[in-house]
Amino acid sequence: MGSSEAETPAKANKASAPQEQQPPATSSIATPTVYPDWTSFQGYPPIPPHGFFPSPVVSNPQGHPYMWGPQPMMPPYGTPPYVIYPPGGIYAHPSMRPGAHPFAPYTMTSPNGNPDAAGTTTTAATAGGETNGKSSEGKEKSPIKRSKGSLGSLNMITGKNCVEHGKTSGASVNGTISQSGESGSESSSEGSEANSQNDSQHKESGQEQDGDVRSSQNGVSPSPSQAQLKQTLAIMQMPSSGPVPGPTTNLNIGMDYWANTASSSPALHGKVTPTAIPGAVAPTEPWMQDERELKRQKRKQSNRDSARRSRLRKQAECEELAQRAEVLKQENASLKDEVSRIRKEYDELLSKNSSLKDNVGDKQHKTDEAGLDNKLQHSGDDSQKDTN
């Protein structure tokens, strides 16, 4: 025991010796002043700053409160940070995930997976709990629970237990019951009991009930106008065999249609059921046929008008060409007459020229003969004188 007690003071002295040597080393490094409330500020805007080039001279570790510290050439670990964030050397960033701040440029995510930029997120579990709490009185709960953000349970997809889901989906957060949920659930339940082959109707009703559940979970109850618009509009089925009765059509159907007033317009053959909404108009088959016939007649009339215009244009061009041909024929005839007259004059001039040439040649020949005779006489007289 005595040896162990003697060894412990020696170890304590050895351990205290390095601790006494460390303070001079740490005291030589100046520690920067850090304000405790800097982590709660979003001090950097989302605009990316200009490029930063590190200087070769080591800067002061006590950085300016509005400037970044020296950026290292090599990142200390992992990938380098984004440009919009300063390097984490001197200033510490607030430990907040992107989108958690209400005024951040990122959308805030809600627990059910739907982004909400306004910052108001509703939990699907709480809304679903309220609706289930209000609608579970006197009703059995579904064996399969609905998960958060899911599109629907297995019963809705397969088309079973549509009555319970329709009634539960009809109850919204405000306690109002939408008419579409009840009507869809009743029609789907009756169809499943009457005939097991109407799977498509069950799927459609399940989709409508799923949409109502999602709207009630988001805290939006359908308004009376929306409930009225969701009601099914019944249209009278027309007989498929034989031609569909419609108003008689003629060539002036367009003029009659536009000229008649509202009071004199013929009544439609289609019938609207008493359950139809006054604001919604169900187009019947005769009305559609009348519109198609009217469009066809208008198209035919426009084609006839364009053909008539083109025919008149061609006729006018032909008449103009015929008139020009007549004028050119008359000019050609006059030119031919003038050419024939000029040719006659030319022939007359040629005959006169030939006659003049003949006269001139005869006169010259006579003068030449007379000159030769005179020369011969003079030469005979000279020879007689020489002989004498």
Curated annotation (Swiss-Prot):
Residue ranges spanning the membrane: these are: none
Q: Compositionally biased, Basic and acidic residues: which spans? A: 302-316, 359-369, 375-388
- Region Basic motif: list its residue ranges: 295-314
Segment forming the signal sequence? none
State the compartments where it is located.
Nucleus
Main location as per UniProt: nucleus
- Domain of life assignment: Eukaryota
Q: Spans of biased composition, class Polar residues? A: 16-31, 169-179, 214-231
**Tissues/organs with expression:** Highly expressed in roots and at lower levels in stems and leaves.
According to the entry, every stretch annotated as the bZIP domain falls at 293-356
Gene Ontology MF: a single term? sequence-specific DNA binding
Q: CDD domains given for it?
A: bZIP_plant_GBF1
* Region called Disordered, residue ranges: 1-41, 103-316, 348-388
Query: What are its GO biological-process terms?
Result: defense response; regulation of DNA-templated transcription
Q: Which InterPro entries match?
A: bZIP (IPR004827), bZIP_plant_GBF1 (IPR045314), bZIP_sf (IPR046347), GBF-like (IPR044827), MFMR (IPR012900)
Quote the cellular component terms of the Gene Ontology held in the record.
nucleus
Upregulation: Induced during incompatible interaction with the fungal pathogen Puccinia striiformis. Induced by abscisic acid (ABA), ethylene, cold stress, salt stress and wounding.
Renumbered to this chain, region (Leucine-zipper) spans 321-356
Comp. bias regions, Low complexity: 117-129, 180-193
Alphabetically list the UniProt keywords.
DNA-binding, Nucleus, Plant defense, Stress response, Transcription, Transcription regulation
Homology family: Belongs to the bZIP family.
Q: What does this protein do?
A: Probable transcription factor that may be involved in responses to fungal pathogen infection and abiotic stresses.
Instruction: Provide the protein name.
Output: bZIP transcription factor 1-A
Q: What is the lineage of its organism?
A: Eukaryota, Viridiplantae, Streptophyta, Embryophyta, Tracheophyta
